[in-house]
Amino acid sequence: MRKTKINFDIELDQNNVPEKIMWDATDKPETGFTEAKSISISLWDHEQKNTMRIDLWSKDMPVEEMKKFYIDCIGGLSQSVLSSTGDEHMAAEINELCERLVKYIRNQPQ
């Protein structure tokens, strides 16, 4: 059986706030760790029937980028729902939410 790994290396300040987030994966095209400003990982716990989440962001990630990041995450869920369940209605509803959120952040003062 083939195996693959994803690794995260998080540098924390004295208050345990992420200063630097690095990641690497065995299937990543380039070699070595790459910096990221935020990660959001969701895991389904089959025993508890709930989702475990890990959300981290570096303290220098701009708020505007954080909002875009979460809209991108939600949009990715739309494709995941469609691919994994075939539920076109649910995928379309998620996409519509993303479109509303994009309009919302575009209308916010800079």
Residue ranges of predicted features:
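Structured beta-strand/loop patches that form or line metal/cofactor-binding pockets in enzymes
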Residues: 1-7
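Active-site- and interface-proximal helix/loop "cap" or "latch" segments in soluble metabolic
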Residues: 19-86
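Short, acidic, Ser/Thr-enriched surface-loop or helix-capping motifs
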Residues: 12-13
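C-terminal charged interaction modules
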Residues: 78-110
